[in-house]
Design a protein with these regions (language model features):
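S-adenosyl-L-methionine
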Residues: 1-37, 42, 47-48, 55, ...
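Class I S-adenosyl-L-methionine
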Residues: 267-309
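Short amphipathic alpha-helix with an adjacent loop that forms part of the alpha/beta core around
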Residues: 27-30, 193-199
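Short loop/edge segments at beta-strand edges and connector loops
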Residues: 185-188, 277
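Conserved proline-anchored active-site loop of SAM-dependent methyltransferases
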Residues: 38-52, 65-69, 133-140, 147, ...
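Mobile active-site "lid"/loop adjacent to the S-adenosyl-L-methionine
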Residues: 146-160, 209-230
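Class I S-adenosyl-L-methionine-dependent methyltransferase module
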Residues: 55-179, 183
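Conserved Class I SAM-dependent methyltransferase catalytic core
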Residues: 231-279
Length: 314
């Protein structure tokens, strides 16, 4: 029996708690057609990816994952291809962290590691992946945020017992990533379009969400903003992959325009729109943790999800 896989990184907008609702809206053919190519253009922390890898009822012919964050994708590759080298670097960093007995010492070490990470001084991909994971697990509230120059700028988080080197998880994730035919891409989401296999592609699209208000979200995961113009480009991408015969599901916020109408129901007119309800646990203001409605858009009907949506609204 293979070990249990879980996301190796904390990532805002992670889908772990939403998966039961999302799976209720899956197209039925992913359970019956082993020739399907599964694509995630915005893989992020990989909650959906790892869940599907472990689902014994789903068998994909091929998997394509992509993210614009090069360091995140370097982590995926390091975990898949060289987990023991990565663990060696993580153990070294973990030893240094716990050697510091005061919070001031741990804080100084954090900023020294952050400076090394931002300077590009790492001597290997595994060292850079290890620093990425260390910063993610010891920074404030598990955020990933960069400034306009692309430098990671989240402060030290003062966590009591951060798990810096989760050897069991990294080895489990590596085993699962090596159990399938998987291609890992870095860059703009649109490049996955060339991997669409007509009639045999399911794509889960989880882009940066449109903020519910001008002050409702922290700044970017990369130094490339994902504004309304980008949301419109993404809709055009969905039109293209639909025309190529791909099946897709897209998540986003239930953002409203100035008149109070749903931004995404208007933008994706002609597609199927549902609601799901998300507990949000990573936020710059950690005390704000509540269930928020989100939009789920598909290019196929799903009565089970529509019934679920209606019951939530009543």
């Amino acid at each position: 029996m293979m070990p249990h896989a879980k996301p190796f990184v904390k990532w805002a907008g992670g889908k772990s708690k939403l998966i039961p609702q999302l799976k209720a809206a899956f197209p039925p053919q992913i359970y019956t057609d082993p020739s399907i190519t599964y694509i995630e253009p915005f893989v992020g922390g990989g909650a959906m990816l790892f869940h599907l890898l472990m689902d014994e009822h789903i068998h994909f012919k091929r998997i394509i994952i992509n993210d614009i964050n090069a360091d995140l994708m370097n982590c995926y590759r390091s975990i898949k291809d060289s987990p023991h080298d990565l663990l060696k670097e993580l153990h070294r960093i973990e030893e240094l962290h716990w050697h510091m007995h005061s919070e001031n010492g741990k804080s100084e070490l954090f900023y020294a590691h952050r400076d090394r990470y931002n300077s590009g001084a790492c001597t290997s991909e595994q060292e850079r992946a290890a620093l990425f994971l260390y910063l993610n697990h010891t920074c404030f509230n598990g955020l990933y945020r960069v400034n306009t120059e692309g430098a990671f700028n989240v402060p030290y988080g003062k966590r009591k017992k951060p798990i810096i080197c989760n050897e069991e998880r990294i080895l489990a994730d590596s085993e699962w990533l090596n159990s399938v035919d998987i291609t890992m891409l870095t860059g703009d989401y649109a490049q996955v379009e060339s991997y669409v296999d007509k009639g045999h592609t399911f794509m889960y699209i989880d882009p940066p969400y449109k903020p519910l208000s001008p002050t409702s979200s922290f700044k970017e995961y990369s130094n490339t903003p994902f504004n309304d113009k980008e949301q419109e480009h993404l809709k055009e991408f969905c039109d293209r992959i639909s025309a190529q015969g791909a099946t897709f599901m897209l998540s986003n916020s239930d953002a409203r325009d100035e008149s109070g109408d749903s931004y995404f129901q208007r933008l994706y007119e002609g597609y199927h729109c549902h609601h799901v309800y998300a507990p949000r646990s990573i936020n710059p203001q950690a005390q704000i943790r509540k269930h928020l409605p989100e939009i789920l858009i598909t290019n196929y009907p799903d009565h089970e999800q529509e019934d679920y949506d209606s019951s939530q609204q009543s």
